[in-house]
Amino acid sequence: MASKESKQMITGKSFEYSLLVQFEEKLKKQTNVQVIKNSSFQIAKECFESVSVLEQSEYSLSASFAVNFLMDIEPRLSNDIGKDDILQLEILSDDKGKKGDVRDVLAIRLLQKWEIGVSAKNNHHAVKHSRLSSSIDFGEKWFGIKVSKNYFDKV
């Protein structure tokens, strides 16, 4: 039997894969899409393929709703500025999260110098709790501006 941690990893990676697939399926009809098939992609795909068909369907449905919402509020996902404006989709490594970047799936338009990231949480306690900590300077990591000593003293 899989441990709780490994089951959470499998479900989390499965949902990340579902999000990326839904982005690709919905957006390839409207713009040029390129999926970055790195090691994180391969791991997520293997996790997705290891769960039941019912779980795959549930993840895909949830991901579909999320992607539809994001497409409604973020026009750059589906609107390119020409045939060379490729939307790259990537699953980030967990190492990024350890360094303060909590995004799991990234959509990038290099030509527009634009990106949007999604922190994929599926029935997970992290939805209720931020990933801020007393040791990671999220201001420096996210914005290039250090948080105050007062912040760290209070956290």
Pin down the residues of each PLM region.
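Short loop/turn segments at secondary-structure transitions that flank enzyme active sites
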Residues: 111, 122-127
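Active-site beta-strand-loop-beta-strand hairpin of nuclease catalytic cores
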Residues: 106-117
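Acidic, metal/cofactor-coordinating or nucleic-acid-engaging core segments within structured domains
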Residues: 127-155
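A short catalytic or substrate-binding loop motif that flags glycine-/basic-rich loops and adjacent residues
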Residues: 96-101
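Acidic-basic catalytic patches of nuclease active cores, encompassing PD-(D/E)XK
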Residues: 1-95
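Enzymatic toxin/effector payload domains
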Residues: 81, 124, 154
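Generic signature of intrinsically disordered, low-complexity, basic-rich segments
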Residues: 62, 113-115, 130-131, 151
